[in-house]
UniProtKB/Swiss-Prot annotation:
It comes from the Bacteria. Belongs to the universal ribosomal protein uL23 family. The gene is rplW. It comes from Chlorobium phaeovibrioides (strain DSM 265 / 1930). This is Large ribosomal subunit protein uL23. One of its GO terms (cellular component) is ribosome. GO terms for molecular function: rRNA binding; structural constituent of ribosome. GO terms for biological process: translation.
Length: 103
């Protein structure tokens, strides 16, 4: 499988997991499995992965009343992976980013 990692999941809760437990949260492809996720994180960031936990979130159904009647839609399903790293290892998501104002 190609790279299953889509993007880091940066929320208040995931940042707390990173600071307290050394766990990082990623949004991954729906068909990704734990072994593919582990290999992708180790290859991309050069760290040792201790464990991987995954969870599937079903997309919500949305309804909106319009002049033509009720329009229904659905948000996309997502899959997240919680990756635990070895002792003393970190991932820096902002290493390639330039601060505002610098060219």
């Amino acid at each position: 499988m190609k790279n299953p990692l889509l993007r880091p999941w940066l929320t208040e809760k995931s940042t707390g997991l990173t600071e307290d437990r050394g766990q990082y949260v990623f949004q991954v492809k729906l068909d990704a499995d734990k072994i593919d996720i582990k290999m992708a994180v180790e290859e991309k960031f050069g760290v040792d992965v201790k464990s991987v936990r995954t969870l599937n979130s079903l997309g919500k159904t949305r309804r909106q009343n319009t002049r033509k009647g009720l329009v229904t839609g659905k948000k996309n399903d997502t899959k997240k992976a919680i990756v635990t790293l070895g002792e003393g290892q970190t991932i820096d998501f902002y290493s390639g980013a330039n601060p505002k104002g610098d060219a």
